[in-house]
């Protein structure tokens, strides 16, 4: 009969199970706090009442029932020495009882938390995204921190596009040399050129930039022109030097990923080139060339030196025909002699003297 009734019982849903577990956890936490309060209360009352009783009995005995003989005095004072020890043992016993209750309560609390964690893991695996998100936000204590983390702005990694618009950033503006500020009063008019046209001030390029760009900006700075007219020379070349290495795009296809896996290339196999002055991203270099690569920042034009000097291979000896002939001619050996040298060096015969006479 019980088996039949149990079949008709509806199984609790995940939300109901978590609600029951939360209720039990709340009750156990309240019981733990209540148990700690009771322990302090009972131990405090024990010490207070025992101390007050000890003082009252001591005064009462001393004033009314103190005998004159020393042996009787020692016998009557003996309970006053045993009483503090007895109170100390009672205090230890109370602390032991309350600590045991706290341990049992903590064990149940840990079991319930483990069960709750297991159910939440099953929810993340089995439930849909919408239901799982709602359950986690309701029952997971760490879910309150997730909106705060999502609300914090994350600086996206920017990739250079056509025309290199990314180089006109606030970093370059931060490092631009600023001239002396000119106080602008309301109603003041901009300076006029020779033809009566207003002159616009064009900011100079960043320090360390190409010299031709600085000269161009200086020449254009005080050139009289009308408002809205194009600046000569601007737009003819990109704002700064090109990136040292390209930045790999984020949205790569499956074919690109397969090729990167086969070749051994990709973002995980490259190192970012970060400027030491403005901390800007200047592309990604290969592992082999990262420590030996020197580059100029595309934003502040700072020259970043290489971390290491590239080792140079030993020079190979030169084997050519002329050097070989020179080496053979310089080696000592029997030199070929001519016929005249042979005749002059031959010794004179016995029948001839030094002057050729017989």
From Swiss-Prot:
Subcellular location(s): the record lists:
Endoplasmic reticulum membrane
Per the record, the zinc finger regions (C4-type) lie at 275-300
Its family remark reads:
Belongs to the lunapark family.
Q: How is it modified after translation?
A: Phosphorylated. Phosphorylation occurs during interphase. Phosphorylation also occurs during mitosis; these phosphorylations reduce both its homodimerization and the ER three-way tubular junction formation.
The GO terms describing molecular function are: identical protein binding; zinc ion binding
Task: Print the keywords alphabetically.
Answer: Coiled coil, Endoplasmic reticulum, Membrane, Metal-binding, Transmembrane, Transmembrane helix, Zinc, Zinc-finger
Tell me yes or no: is Iron among this UniProt entry's keywords. Answer: no
**Protein's UniProt name:** Endoplasmic reticulum junction formation protein lunapark-B
Q: Which residues lie on this side of the membrane: Lumenal?
A: 67-69
User: What are the coiled-coil residue ranges?
Assistant: 9-41, 99-128
Quaternary structure?
A: Homodimer; homodimerization requires the C4-type zinc finger motif and decreases during mitosis in a phosphorylation-dependent manner.
- TM ranges: 46-66, 70-90
Cite the InterPro entries for this sequence: Lnp, Lunapark_Znf
Annotated region (Disordered), positions in chain? 320-358
Q: Which is a GO BP term held by this UniProt record?
A: positive regulation of endoplasmic reticulum tubular network organization
Q: How does it sit in the membrane?
A: Multi-pass membrane protein
Lineage of the species this protein comes from: Eukaryota, Metazoa, Chordata, Craniata, Vertebrata
């Amino acid at each position: 009969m019980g088996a039949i009734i149990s079949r008709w019982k509806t199984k609790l849903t995940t939300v109901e199970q978590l609600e029951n577990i939360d209720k039990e956890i709340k009750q156990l936490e309240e019981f733990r706090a209540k148990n700690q309060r009771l322990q302090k209360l009972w131990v405090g009352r024990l010490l207070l009442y025992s101390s007050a009783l000890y003082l009252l009995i001591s005064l009462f005995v001393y004033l009314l029932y103190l005998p004159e003989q020393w042996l009787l005095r020692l016998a009557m004072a003996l309970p006053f020495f045993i009483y503090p020890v007895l109170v100390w043992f009672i205090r230890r016993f109370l602390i032991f009882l309350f600590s045991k209750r706290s341990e049992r309560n903590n064990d149940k609390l840990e079991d319930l938390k483990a069960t709750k964690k297991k159910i939440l893991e099953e929810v993340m695996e089995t439930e849909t995204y919408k239901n799982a998100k709602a359950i986690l936000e309701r029952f997971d204590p760490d879910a309150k921190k997730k909106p705060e983390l999502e609300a914090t702005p994350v600086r996206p990694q920017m990739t250079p596009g056509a025309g290199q618009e990314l180089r006109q950033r606030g970093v370059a503006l931060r490092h631009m040399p600023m001239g002396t500020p000119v106080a602008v009063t309301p109603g003041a008019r901009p300076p006029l050129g020779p033809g009566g046209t207003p002159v616009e001030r064009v900011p100079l390029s960043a320090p360390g930039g190409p010299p031709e760009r600085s000269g161009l900006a200086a020449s254009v700075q005080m050139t009289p022109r009308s408002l809205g007219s194009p600046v000569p020379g601007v737009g003819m070349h990109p704002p700064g030097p090109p990136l040292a290495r390209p930045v790999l795009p984020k949205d790569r296809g499956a074919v690109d990923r397969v090729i990167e896996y086969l070749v051994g290339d990709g973002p995980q196999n490259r190192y970012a080139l970060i400027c030491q002055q403005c901390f800007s991203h200047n592309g990604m270099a290969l592992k082999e060339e990262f420590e030996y690569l020197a580059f100029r920042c595309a934003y502040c034009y700072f020259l970043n030196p290489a971390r290491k000097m590239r080792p140079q291979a030993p020079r190979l000896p030169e084997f050519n025909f002329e050097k070989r002939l020179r080496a053979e001619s310089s080696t000592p050996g029997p030199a070929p002699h001519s016929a005249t040298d042979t005749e002059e060096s031959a010794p004179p015969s016995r029948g001839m003297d030094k002057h050729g006479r017989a």
